[in-house]
Swiss-Prot record:
GO terms for molecular function: small ribosomal subunit rRNA binding; structural constituent of ribosome. Residues 1-25 are annotated as: Disordered. PANTHER family: 30S RIBOSOMAL PROTEIN S20, SMALL RIBOSOMAL SUBUNIT PROTEIN BS20C. It comes from Exiguobacterium sp. (strain ATCC BAA-1283 / AT1b). Keywords: Ribonucleoprotein, Ribosomal protein, RNA-binding, rRNA-binding. The lineage of its organism: Bacteria, Bacillati, Bacillota, Bacilli, Bacillales. Coiled coil: none annotated. Pfam families: Ribosomal_S20p. It comes from the Bacteria. This is Small ribosomal subunit protein bS20. The keyword Ribosomal protein applies.
């Protein structure tokens, strides 16, 4: 445990950010998995609606630095290709 006051504050802040970041990443992964599940079912309309939400989550995670912007683009491209193949 930190002894210096500023280090204690930084530890608290880091823990809060770690929890928030992990929640944001989990929501992003869930949105992507939902699109994949709908594609496997063959439900194109629902998959397109879920794709909009997944795109939003991926872009937000990339802008916050949770994932690299290229990974966000790659994931969006792959999801779009799967939907287009339906």
């Amino acid at each position: 445990m930190a002894n210096i006051k500023s280090a204690i504050k930084r530890a608290k802040t880091s823990e809060k950010r770690r929890v928030a970041n992990s929640q944001e990443k989990a929501a992003m992964r869930t949105a992507v998995k939902r699109v994949d599940a709908l594609v496997l079912e063959g439900n194109k309309e629902a998959a397109q609606e879920a794709f909009v939400l997944a795109t939003k989550k991926l872009d937000k995670a990339a802008s916050k630095g949770l994932i690299h912007k290229n990974k966000a683009g790659r994931d969006k491209s792959r999801l779009a290709a799967r939907i287009a193949a339906l």
